Design a protein with these regions (language model features):
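Feature captures hydrophobic
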Residues: 1-111
Length: 111
């Protein structure tokens, strides 16, 4: 089983992507809350993006995130380490996501 520390380390990969100039351009003027729920760890992390910048990434849950992702921690780590494609994880039911299609497509760029 994946530990909470392992998922926090993996989420740093997402955090570091916000320093990439190409990603900053793609996310310019983008303000959303993205919530990742890891049922196997019984925990939720919230990424707050404000005007294309990462405002925060912390263990937190809100009632109505713009994007809700439900995934097992091992699958998330495999996605971030490029062992599995996020679209394949979605189509096989390993990743469940709720949100506007345009937001979900942007989410792919973070993963």
């Amino acid at each position: 089983m994946t530990s909470k520390k392992e998922i926090e380390d993996a989420l740093k990969i997402v955090k570091n992507k916000f320093y990439d100039p190409k990603l900053k351009t793609r996310f310019a003027n983008y303000t959303k809350n993205i919530q990742f729920t890891f049922n196997d760890l019984n925990t939720t992390y919230l990424i707050k993006i404000r005007n294309g910048d990462l405002e925060s990434l912390k263990e937190e849950s809100i009632d109505s995130p713009d994007i809700q992702v439900i995934i097992e921690s091992r699958i998330m780590i495999d996605i971030l380490n490029k062992k599995i494609n996020p679209m394949k994880a979605y189509t096989t039911g390993k990743l469940k996501a709720k949100g506007k299609l345009t937001d979900l497509l942007k989410l792919q760029k973070l993963l």
